[in-house]
């Protein structure tokens, strides 16, 4: 910390002690507000200076917030007070709030202090709506000065590490998180109206399942048991489908022990939903309708800007088989490739990076990820994923090499994963056994055998469609945020 900052903190500590010596509580008590900054502007800004003067008797208000600017000398001064909704100017005069409060509270007030004001509305000569203070109350003394003259943090990493400072100084950041909350609320509203039931399932699992990812491992001391933080919500929700809860969803945290990037955080928020008697076509329709609804309700339009690109959520979304997508981009037709050896040869010919033990389906997926994925800017459903990478999805009845699965891509990123759920317990066991072979060959993200889940399927699960959406990435898209850290209040940061 700079010498200047240390000096400022020392002065603030001295002011704190002076307040205590005067018998003033520098950290205040309950303060009743009558309005927020935005409410005052909505109610009073339409009136002229003269009209407000005539309405002074009926414009008594009380506001509270953080002191963001302060100016003026002598017996009067102006300041801006900020709350969640914005800023409002206040005007403080000694002959209005009293000599004692003016000298002890107003004159010693620092930027960052939290204050309460009671007064009346008026407009200045320049036409700015303001509150003429009748009382001025200190609610919390700030012992540290705000960074960068309160114009916002310039150090991006500091914004993430000290989100509270970012929220104080950056209204755009605050609005992003308000919008995040609204997005999740509209998601709930949409699903509740569709008859879905919101549920809660365990975050600590005995088997890490439901996705291809490395788990975080923990230990239950009393039971002497190894547990895994969930990498997906899926398998517990499908047990509920077996139990007769026909339309369920959960919004919750998921944990994956993987890298950190602009698109990945070790803990993130997902929604997973499952609907009995539906298939992946129904879930495509639901996904498209729900995302469009959220954009329209929260932002007033189903066309959004992302990184200077207009994303059209309003028009019908493209639906493309993964084989056709690869063929369009590379000319390679995986319908005509009949063996792993042919797939490996095609990969070598087109410079596709593959690893040992990859089979037909893995190689098709590598073609897609390396040649197609980043080109999918407008909303596109890619469906028909190969069976090797879809251990929980139902086989396509017309071509068992593929599954009834889709992923949603927008701005070159995956935003959703869904399929017609595999409800055949015999097939499911065979898929898990194939995953165990992959694990033995070095794929540490392959799925474990889950006997309890197979037992649940043996009681009978109806045909079911399921969906998972990464909420953080959806918020990134809808708020035009370049990094996942911009939409997580407290993203993971490497320790200093």
Curated annotation (Swiss-Prot):
Molecular-function GO terms, alphabetical: ATP binding; catalytic activity, acting on a protein; lysine-tRNA ligase activity; magnesium ion binding; transferase activity; tRNA binding
Q: Does the keyword Cytoplasm apply?
A: yes
Its required cofactor(s), as named, are:
Mg(2+)
Q: Which residues bind Mg(2+) 1 per the record? A: 407, 414
Origin superkingdom: Bacteria
Where in the cell?
Cytoplasm
Question: One GO BP annotation here?
Answer: lysyl-tRNA aminoacylation
Which InterPro entries does the protein's record reference?
Answer: Aa-tRNA-synt_II, aa-tRNA-synth_II, aa-tRNA-synth_II/BPL/LPL, Lys-tRNA-ligase_II, Lys-tRNA-ligase_II_bac/euk, Lys-tRNA-ligase_II_N, Lys-tRNA-synth_II_C, NA-bd_OB-fold
Oligomeric and partner information? Homodimer.
Q: What is this protein called?
A: Lysine--tRNA ligase
């Amino acid at each position: 910390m700079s010498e200047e900052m240390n000096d400022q903190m020392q002065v603030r500590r001295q002011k704190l002690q002076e307040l205590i010596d005067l018998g003033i509580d520098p950290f205040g008590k309950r303060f009743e507000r009558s309005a927020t900054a935005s409410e005052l502007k909505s109610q009073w800004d339409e009136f002229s200076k003269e009209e407000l003067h005539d309405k002074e008797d009926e414009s008594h208000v009380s506001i509270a917030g953080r002191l963001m600017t302060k100016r003026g000398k002598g017996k009067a001064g102006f300041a801006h007070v900020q709350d969640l909704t914005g800023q409002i100017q206040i005007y403080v005069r000694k002959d209005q709030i009293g000599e004692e409060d003016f000298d002890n509270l107003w004159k010693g007030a620092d930027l960052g202090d939290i204050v309460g004001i009671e007064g009346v509305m008026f407009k200045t000569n320049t036409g700015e709506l303001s509150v003429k203070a009748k009382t001025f109350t200190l609610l919390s003394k700030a012992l540290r000065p705000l960074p960068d003259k309160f114009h916002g943090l310039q150090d991006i990493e500091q914004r993430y590490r000290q989100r509270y400072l970012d929220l104080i100084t950056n209204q755009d950041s605050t609005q992003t998180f308000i919008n995040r909350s609204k997005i999740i609320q509209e998601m709930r509203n949409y699903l509740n109206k569709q008859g879905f039931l919101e549920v809660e399932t365990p975050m600590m699992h005995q088997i890490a399942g439901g996705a291809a990812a490395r788990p975080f491992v923990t230990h239950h001391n009393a039971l002497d048991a190894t547990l895994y933080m969930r990498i997906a919500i899926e398998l517990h929700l499908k047990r509920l489908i077996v139990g007769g809860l026909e339309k369920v969803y959960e919004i919750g945290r998921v944990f994956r022990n993987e890298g950190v990037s602009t698109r990945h955080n070790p803990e993130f928020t997902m929604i997973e939903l499952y609907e009995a008697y539906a298939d992946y076509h129904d879930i495509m329709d639901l996904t498209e309708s729900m995302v469009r609804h959220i954009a329209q309700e929260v932002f007033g339009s189903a066309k959004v800007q992302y990184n200077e690109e207009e994303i059209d959520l309003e028009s019908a979304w493209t639906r493309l088989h993964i084989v056709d997508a690869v063929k369009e981009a590379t000319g390679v037709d995986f319908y005509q490739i009949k063996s792993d050896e042919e797939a490996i040869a095609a990969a070598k010919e087109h410079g596709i990076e593959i690893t040992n033990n990859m089979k037909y389906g893995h190689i098709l997926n590598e073609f897609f990820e390396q040649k197609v994925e980043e080109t999918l800017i407008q909303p596109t459903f890619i469906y028909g994923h190969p069976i090797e990478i879809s251990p929980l999805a139902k086989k396509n009845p017309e071509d068992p090499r593929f599954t009834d699965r889709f992923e949603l891509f927008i701005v070159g990123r995956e935003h959703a994963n869904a399929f017609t759920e595999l409800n055949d317990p015999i097939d499911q066991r065979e898929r898990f056994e194939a995953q165990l072979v992959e694990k033995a060959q070095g794929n540490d993200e392959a799925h474990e055998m889950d006997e309890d889940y197979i037992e649940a399927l043996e009681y009978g699960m109806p045909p079911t469609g399921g969906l998972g959406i990464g909420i953080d990435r959806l918020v990134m898209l809808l708020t035009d945020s370049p990094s996942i850290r911009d939409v997580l209040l407290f993203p993971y940061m490497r320790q200093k």
